[in-house]
Amino acid sequence: MLARKDFPGTVSGGYAEAMFEGIFWDNDGVLMETEHLYFQANAEALARAGVELTLALFQEISLRRGESVLALASGDGEELRSWRDGRYRELLSAEAQVIPGVTETLQCLHGQLPMAIVTSCRRENFLQMHRTSGLLDYFDFILTREDYRNSKPDPEPYRAACTRAGLDPGRCLAVEDSERGVTAAARAGLTVAAIPGDLNRGGDFSTARWHLDSILQLPGLLGFDGQPHR
């Protein structure tokens, strides 16, 4: 777990506090534009093994079920995974970008409610993509793949986050972009705001309370004025 500080008490007053005591954020596809890079790294790795990875297969296996597409190849899985991971970090170093609207949204919400990141991304990859993002100081702690046994769509990541925060899941909001992430948060008892990206459109988001077109809609939904909190 990556921790900046313990959760502070919630800010008194305001519509959002009446609804929620904390906000948990997915990373890839919500904060950072990286899922197309992960697809590229997996496709290139599988091509080395003579397997063609289509976007539809990637969406079904990785983004919806949360399973590894490398299982499509036979042979030395660890060698293929190692090559894929190295290639992915190269792509992250060169091309990972903060999704438009994220910085402004976090500036508005920071200090209003406790916030944390709950991601299936491995810690090394997470830190690589955030080297220059400027986002991490907005969060009280971060859970990466190494911090729990079962990944999304299992509810364990969000249950672990609520336990770490000392918060009732029913009083927390999760912000997700994928079917597996929405499923994980809903199964853990959180309210979910879904912001499907291009690679996740067409998924089952029926358990999300809200379906947003842009992250910039979130502050207004929570009753904030959209101005950075001081």
What is each residue range found by the language model?
Residues 2-20, 103, 107, 123-230:
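Asp-based, Mg2+/Mn2+-dependent phosphohydrolase catalytic module
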Residues 18-107, 111:
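N-terminal helical cap/lid subdomain that shapes the substrate entry/recognition surface
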Residues 30, 119-121:
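Conserved phosphate-coupling serine/threonine residues in phosphotransfer and NTP-handling enzymes
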Residues 63, 122-123:
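Short "lid" loop at the C-terminus of a central beta-strand within the Rossmann-like core
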Residues 91-96, 120, 188-189:
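Short, flexible loop segments at the rims of nucleotide/cofactor-binding pockets, characterized by
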Residues 112-113, 189:
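Glycine-centered short loops/turns at secondary-structure junctions
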